[in-house]
């Protein structure tokens, strides 16, 4: 076991991500004084229960990307974990220092599978700590890291499919009334920033490694 861990040190990133997940869980139950995030644009966005499908697909897309990288591309996995960890750590800090919530979630009454799924999401995902949107942040940053890094960078069709799915996931946060437009914008901006930072740091580290091995 110790020998396997020494050859697969990238797995240690999982410990940090698990710790952050636990920290996020704690922030959901602190009972802090929440600041309402509500833009005029939010009232113009319709409630579209069918988009709950894409909201739920996030729970498969994010671990799916990381599992593939963990098993097939260790360097990509380390980049994923670094980007996720840096941004999520900042998010947790924001959730503690400036806790937020939304006040426009509908009752989702009625029949039908999509409304039932919305009620299920509402029951298990409280509308607190919404800014920035982790749903948008994690989906977009994983897309940027995974599909702008070899070997998947050359898979144009797969990269396009991933982009479309991430776009739909981000839109779903608005259309199922889980987030404000402000949350989406902040989450996506943070994803771009985290991707740029990790790309720079890993490129610098690789350049230093190449220089020292010459």
What are these regions (language model features)?
Residues 143-148, 191-199:
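Hydrophobic transmembrane alpha-helices
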Residues 154-167:
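Short hydrophobic alpha-helices at membrane interfaces in multi-pass membrane enzymes
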């Amino acid at each position: 076991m110790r020998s396997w861990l020494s050859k697969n040190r990238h797995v240690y990133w999982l410990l940090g991500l698990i710790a952050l997940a636990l920290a996020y869980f704690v922030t959901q139950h602190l009972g802090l004084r929440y600041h309402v995030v509500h833009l005029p644009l939010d009232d113009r966005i319709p409630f579209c229960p069918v988009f709950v499908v894409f909201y739920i697909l996030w729970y498969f897309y994010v671990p799916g990307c990381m599992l593939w990288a963990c098993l097939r591309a260790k360097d990509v996995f380390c980049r994923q974990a670094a980007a996720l960890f840096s941004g999520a750590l900042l998010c947790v800090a924001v959730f503690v220092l400036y806790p937020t919530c939304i006040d426009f979630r509908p009752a989702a009454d009625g029949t039908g599978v999509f409304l039932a799924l919305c009620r299920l999401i509402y029951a298990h995902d409280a509308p607190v700590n919404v800014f920035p949107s982790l749903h948008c942040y994690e989906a977009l940053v994983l897309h940027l890291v995974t599909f702008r890094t070899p070997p998947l960078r050359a898979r144009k069709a797969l990269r396009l499919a991933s982009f479309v799915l991430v776009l739909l996931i981000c839109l779903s946060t608005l259309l199922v009334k889980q987030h404000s437009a402000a949350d989406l914008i902040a989450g996506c901006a943070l994803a771009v920033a985290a991707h740029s930072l990790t790309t720079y740091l890993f490129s610098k580290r690789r350049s230093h490694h190449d220089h020292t091995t010459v």
